[in-house]
Amino acid sequence: MFRASDADYYNPDEAARRLIAANPGLDQTTANATAWRQGKRLLERAINERLDLAFETTLGGSTMPRLLAEAASQGIEVRIWYVGLASPEAHIERVRRRVDAGGHGIPEADIRRRWRHSRLNLVQLLPVLTEVRIYDNSQDADPAEAKAPRPMLVLHVVRGKIVGPPDLLSTPGWAKPIVAAAIELHG
């Protein structure tokens, strides 16, 4: 979806893979840190030069949410497409499967911290966002189908107005605090 947009797109996981491929012997931790710093620089440049940039982040730390809030305070339109899972255990299982398929791992403590902090950071960003779409990606796809699951839209807010989905009663438990904050903020 983002690759088809007019914005530049940055995925730190893909950047880390390219770094490792170009630098045999580079460890995953160093590649991840380097890719993260590259993404931070790209975001700072996009803010300073008012460029369009789409990028992936967990929102689990403090730097990216701070930069996004800073961008919004400068009048830059900030849109977030947030994709969540039902629990940290679901994330841990997905990472385990990724590792089994040859991908990189993430320490369990980091997954749990990011799961908690990303939702808190999203709630804190709600007042300044031009648009937010929240998706539940908790459903696993049928391996026989060999395709990714289709995330379910949980909340869509545009310029302070909740525009969807029509039935907020089916909001999954993990997203209820976020939806409640949006309702309190935007009515």
Language-model region placement:
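Conserved substrate/cofactor phosphate-moiety recognition/catalytic segment
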Residues: 1-49
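Short, structured coil segments at secondary-structure junctions
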Residues: 3-5, 74, 128
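A glycine- and Lys/Arg-enriched "phosphate-lid" helix/loop adjacent to the NTP-binding pocket
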Residues: 74-124
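NTP-dependent small-molecule kinase module
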Residues: 125-187
